């Protein structure tokens, strides 16, 4: 199949842009964006993903207001025939590339669901390409993907359950990743080692537990990102980050240290601090405290989401499928589900206020504490 993109001179192999070179069913390509008000009383999480080898395109719009509920809208439909322009779309939701690597617009039209949104994202620092994410378990390559990410600001509006919020320079963050990751497409082969599960990254440590922390941060003057992955004993296997004096060049992070104060009885942080050693000899200090509630990511369809429990990238319907639910987030860590059951998700990503070298700003702080974690004195889970 030919598309307009095939007129360009940017092919990466002997295939058209309608297909991918990998035959792995898990191959994905995702745009994801978050934004939240300075006080954390309102926030959104939005994304669209294409699974070319599963003939599926999915989208999600998740919102929280006043720190007590998470509203979830999920879409899934066949990918083909698909649009070959620069716009990602699924049903009533789309993400437009206004200025590549700088400005995007995400919209969800009003419908028979509790969220409507029109937000324009603009980067405050350049998009940063991470080191490749790769991993094997029992000889099988389970991860092989790329990601770039960017700290920015969001302007526009959001309506949630009839309440309207105007966004003026809300903190925003986005990532775009593509490749192969575990827990996509409905099944993952078992090869001998049981993993802690919960997030795709848990496969990278087998049965040794996972600690992952990421900061995307800005106070308008200084901004940047840092990601660390370690196993449960503290052995580090991934470090990637760079910082900016806004308007200046990137400065690489060469080492980092973290200190976590946990909320009692949970694996959520009350305070997360980082020291970043930079290539220019400086050390930057970050101190984040939660506002709002950490996203329960299965509401987006990831991590065994959707009503069928199969998670992302599964062919579900020959027409547009729409799912809607609302979670009670009033407890610190436990999610009260609409059917009266409870869940304790492993994949949480937190909105925060963050001091950056003593100057207050905001940060987006995913933190996964999965499996055995003896160094933190946490009971096994």
Residue ranges and their predicted role:
Residues 1-381:
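Structured soluble/peripheral alpha/beta segments that form catalytic or ligand/cofactor-binding pockets
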């Amino acid at each position: 199949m030919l598309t307009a993109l095939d007129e360009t001179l940017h092919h990466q192999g002997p295939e058209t842009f309608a297909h991918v070179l990998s035959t792995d069913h898990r191959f994905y390509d995702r745009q994801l964006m978050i934004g939240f008000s300075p006080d954390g009383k309102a926030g959104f999480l939005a994304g669209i993903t294409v699974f070319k080898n599963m003939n599926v395109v999915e989208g999600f719009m998740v919102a929280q207001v006043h720190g007590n509920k998470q509203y979830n809208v999920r879409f899934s439909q066949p990918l083909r025939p698909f649009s070959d322009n620069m716009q990602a779309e699924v049903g009533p939701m789309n993400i437009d590339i206004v200025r590549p690597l700088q400005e995007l617009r995400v919209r969800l039209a009003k419908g028979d669901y509790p969220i409507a949104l029109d937000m324009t994202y603009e980067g405050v620092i350049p998009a940063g390409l991470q080191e490749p994410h790769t991993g094997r378990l029992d000889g099988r390559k389970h991860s092989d993907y790329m990601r770039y990410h960017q700290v920015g600001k969001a302007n526009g509006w959001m309506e949630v359950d009839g309440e309207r919020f105007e966004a003026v320079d809300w903190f925003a963050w986005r990532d775009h990743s593509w490749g192969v990751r575990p827990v996509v497409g409905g099944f993952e082969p078992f090869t001998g080692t049981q993993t802690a599960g919960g997030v795709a990254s848990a496969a990278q440590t087998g049965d040794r537990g996972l600690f992952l922390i990421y900061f995307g941060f800005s106070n308008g003057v200084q901004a940047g990102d840092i990601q660390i992955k370690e196993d449960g004993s503290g052995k580090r296997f991934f470090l990637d980050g760079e910082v900016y004096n806004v308007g200046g060049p990137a400065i690489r992070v060469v080492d980092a240290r973290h200190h976590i104060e946990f909320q009692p009885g949970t694996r959520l942080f009350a305070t997360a601090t980082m020291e970043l050693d930079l290539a220019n000899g400086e050390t930057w200090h970050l101190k984040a405290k939660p506002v709002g509630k950490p996203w329960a990511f299965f509401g987006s369809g990831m991590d065994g989401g959707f009503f069928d429990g199969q998670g992302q990238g599964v062919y579900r319907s020959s027409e547009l499928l729409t799912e809607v639910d609302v979670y009670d987030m009033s407890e610190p860590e436990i999610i009260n589900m609409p059917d009266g059951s409870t869940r304790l998700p492993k994949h949480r990503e937190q909105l925060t206020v963050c001091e950056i070298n003593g100057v207050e700003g905001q940060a987006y702080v995913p933190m996964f504490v999965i499996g055995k974690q003896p160094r933190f004195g946490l009971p096994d889970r």
